[in-house]
Amino acid sequence: MKPAARRRARECAVQALYSWQLSRNDIADVEYQFLAEQDVKDVDVLYFRELLAGVATNTAYLDGLMKPYLSRLLEELGQVEKAVLRIALFELSKRSDVPYKVAINEAIELAKTFGAEDSHKFVNGVLDKAAPVIRPNKK
């Protein structure tokens, strides 16, 4: 699958996770509704589904990974920042096939696209501290 299709999968995952975090609907329903309503022509749909299910299933674990590196309470994070960080931490901790730098760079780009003005700096700061602990060999 092309890298662009993976990037689109991450973009769609941020949007769907944002919706899930706010609605707290079943993740399968959020996925179904998202795929029915959005143009997913250039999206790696399998990867999108894996990100959604992986983040939803591992939310407490992923939140635990980020908490030591947050400069504010988890509850005070914006929903976009939370979704972006959860995706990146899922990739870093559960997807060893995704290179360390790719997971971080993609998260920064997602934060620039969907987040508030400086959220990419915040996301970069958290991941810069968390990633070496999650992947000590930086691969």
UniProtKB/Swiss-Prot annotation:
What does the UniProt record say this protein does?
Involved in transcription antitermination. Required for transcription of ribosomal RNA (rRNA) genes. Binds specifically to the boxA antiterminator sequence of the ribosomal RNA (rrn) operons.
The name on file for this protein is: Transcription antitermination protein NusB
Q: Which domain of life is it from?
A: Bacteria
The organism is Escherichia fergusonii (strain ATCC 35469 / DSM 13698 / CCUG 18766 / IAM 14443 / JCM 21226 / LMG 7866 / NBRC 102419 / NCTC 12128 / CDC 0568-73)
**Stretches of the chain forming a coiled coil according to its record:** none
The Swiss-Prot or TrEMBL record describes its family as follows: Belongs to the NusB family.
Which GO cellular component terms, listed alphabetically, does the Swiss-Prot or TrEMBL entry include?
A: cytosol
Q: Which Gene3D superfamilies match?
A: NusB-like
Name the Pfam families on file. NusB
A biological process from GO: DNA-templated transcription termination
An example of a GO molecular function for this protein is: RNA binding
